[in-house]
Amino acid sequence: IAEFSDPPFRGDVAPNVFPAYYLILKCWGRRFDYFTIPGEKALGCYTPYKSRERIKIIPQGFDLNAVKRRPYEPNPQPTFAYAGRFYERIRDPRFFFDFLETLDADFRFDLYINCLDPCFAEMIRQAQQRVRGRIVLREALPRERLIERLGAADFLINFDNTTSNATPSKLIDYAMTGRPILSFNDRTFDPDGFRAA
């Protein structure tokens, strides 16, 4: 049995993937009787490598008792947070950082990034210099501590994937904080709605 969390590369996400990669995946897939995936949305990403009846959907598990939830206390300045990774053409936040430069208000945006690509590190560095509020790059934390920290924000940011083949597992963690979640990507972002939040 092979377990997946994120789908393998597809042409809509990574059009320049080495062509033999798909053949390698298909050969590799033959070594397993079944694939398990966390959600039905991603099914089409796996059927080129394994027949539908050999793909089982098993949602990701979590232990709610392992999470300590603090009582919410409003922050002195609007504070919002994001946890996860950024990916070019999939989960690219440049539009949001450009928007933050237009805000004429104090705020704090906490970023918990577990792996930061150089292009996004530079984007964050430049934005930190240009915004009126603060953008704070925090260290990656173990899941339970991260959920507790996220619960101290006024609200959470989820950058929706531009592809529809996966749902970020961070939404489970976000929901466990009890904080409001604003989800959007560059096509669905509403600047006026954000200002009202």
Residue locations for each model-derived region?
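Conserved donor-binding/catalytic core segment of Leloir-type glycosyltransferases
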Residues: 73-90, 97-101
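Short acidic alpha-helix that forms the nucleotide-activated donor recognition element
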Residues: 27-30, 142-153, 176
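A short, histidine- and acid-enriched strand-loop-helix "catalytic/donor-clamping" loop
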Residues: 2-16
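Acidic anion/phosphate-binding donor-loop and adjacent secondary structure
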Residues: 13, 61-78
